[in-house]
């Protein structure tokens, strides 16, 4: 509910502050006193379109602050929009002379859209030019469902609808991606089969690289041994040594050649020893466990697979596990596709059964609401008005059912009913809304409801009936009424008077909460005009039950 309203430099207002109470609050004042300025200030603060020239002449800014109480719905909205809830809700709009508007919620800057969304949780406004909520199709549907106690049933239908739509979406995604899913399954099937068969182990690449290096070194040594053996196994070497020894032997015991003969003999023996050593070394090479060609083939294969899947060799095992998991998911999607289609058909059937039941319930509720509203309209001097609720099948199923709901009315005898916004004046729309609110009473209650001149064109007993209904409504929500009718004002819990004062160089608007004596005087003025009489004072006293 509204706690307070602070307005500065707004149109004709220098500065004013109003503190509101629970129950019924009436705002009165002479015609042209500026009562509509308060509504403009509220709409301005909450992001709705108002007059372009709202900054008071001679000032460089205008500002409006409103403080509201909180409920859980408002708190949830604030949290969803990353605004910290406090004990009370402070909303503010500041406009500077250059034209820029700044909106604040709890001193946090927000955009206009957020402010307008918040406003829908705070209050309803009904008046000469503001009955938007009644005219919206969603509001009309909510009014009917609330009246018929159908909101829980509608919630069940909505849940079924969401499940149905989610299933349809999942099927559509599978169908749309069928080709890519098939391709991915083929790819993953091949990859997992290939990697499973290769069974590449962690550290295997490094191990094979080291073995390859060792084998390459051994090959070099082997080739060297073979090359040396090839040279020293040359028969000509042995033949040459033997010939040299024989030539020296012919010299007999010639000491001069004895040392040379000994050297030749040692050379022969050393050569034989070298041959034997190289042969033994050759026999010592072991190729049973690893083969360079096979080692290189495996190593190069691992490197190729690593490049192919763009995965480090040591992570190929992890890649295989993830691929197997993804392959299972995709195969399950395909397997579940037919199951989803069957489920979608069942959900569709259930939805239309629930929607059909809801339509029947709405038709029954509509008849009762039409009758209730007709009785209320009689009391509000609209006995000849016809109100009916048209329910027709919608073009598309929705979370709220398969019905298009239109509130229709005729305010003049002989005229066909049309959509309510096309045939009713602002005052009539307000009384339609009051009749609806009275019929609903404790259902669909916003924290505050504002009625702007709901009593235009009525008086006497009808005005008293309007006041009674406003008073009744104020027992479940805060009701703020701008009125010209003393019968309505007399039932107020809080009476605020707006006055316009013409000074020498400017016009000022002031606001005052009236005490009991001041209320009597104001009601007397409303009854008899500027000249207050004893009779009007007496009538005012009776209205106040003094």
Swiss-Prot record:
Gene Ontology CC terms, in alphabetical order: bacterial nucleoid
Query: Keyword annotations for this protein?
Result: ATP-binding, DNA damage, DNA repair, Nucleotide-binding
**MF terms per GO, please?**
ATP binding
Q: Which InterPro entries match?
A: DNA_recomb/repair_RecN, P-loop_NTPase, RecF/RecN/SMC_N
By its UniProt entry, which Gene3D superfamilies does this protein fall under?
Answer: P-loop containing nucleotide triphosphate hydrolases (3.40.50.300)
Question: Which SUPFAM superfamilies does the record match to this protein?
Answer: P-loop containing nucleoside triphosphate hydrolases
Top-level taxon in the UniProt lineage = Bacteria
* Recorded family membership: Belongs to the RecN family.
Task of the protein: May be involved in recombinational repair of damaged DNA.
User: What protein does this entry describe?
Assistant: DNA repair protein RecN
Q: What is the organism field in this record?
A: Rickettsia felis (strain ATCC VR-1525 / URRWXCal2)
Q: What is the lineage of its organism?
A: Bacteria, Pseudomonadati, Pseudomonadota, Alphaproteobacteria, Rickettsiales
Q: Which gene encodes it?
A: recN
